[in-house]
């Protein structure tokens, strides 16, 4: 019942799977991912905040990954705690943090993600 509630609440949020992950990350400039599970109380509590923010913030693709159904993606990103938020910009991971945020903090974080100098980020990635 709670996972149904979560799914209904996040209708405007794209559900990522192994089959659409690469395409979604590649075809959208900024993508935020909410790693969650249907049994996770804090994940279910965060769902309304995530959805409300998705309706306010423009230029960001809001997505979620059910770590129970997409265990390979959770393992690939070494998700150890949920919820975990991750942001990609221009296909590069620029933020990852376990835990949820308030709506205001989430909006501020996404606005900051829009202003990051990606030329500098790409240089850092090349030097690794």
PLM region descriptions:
Residues 89-120:
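Non-catalytic, surface beta->alpha helical segment in thiol-disulfide oxidoreductase systems
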Residues 13-30, 71:
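A short beta-strand-turn-helix
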Residues 28-32, 45-65:
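Conserved helix-turn-beta segment immediately C-terminal to the redox Cys motif
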Residues 1-10:
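Short, Lys/Arg-enriched N-terminal segments with co-localized hydrophobic residues
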Residues 29, 36-39, 81:
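Short pre-active-site segment immediately N-terminal to redox-active cysteine/selenocysteine motifs
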Residues 71, 77-86:
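Structural micro-motif
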Residues 119-128:
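Short acidic DE-rich linear segments
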Residues 34-36, 87:
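Structural cue for short, hydrophobic secondary-structure segments
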């Amino acid at each position: 019942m709670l996972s149904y509630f979560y799914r209904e609440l996040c209708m405007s949020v794209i559900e990522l799977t192994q089959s659409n992950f690469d395409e979604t990350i590649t075809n959208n400039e900024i993508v935020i991912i909410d790693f969650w599970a249907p049994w996770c109380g804090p994940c279910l509590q965060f769902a309304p905040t995530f959805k409300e923010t998705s309706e306010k913030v423009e230029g960001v693709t809001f997505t979620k990954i059910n770590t129970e159904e997409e265990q390979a993606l959770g393992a690939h990103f070494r998700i150890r705690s949920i919820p975990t938020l991750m942001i990609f910009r221009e296909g590069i991971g620029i933020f990852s943090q376990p835990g949820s945020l308030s709506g205001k903090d989430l909006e501020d974080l996404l606005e900051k993600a829009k202003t990051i100098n990606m030329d500098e980020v790409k240089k850092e990635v090349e030097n690794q």
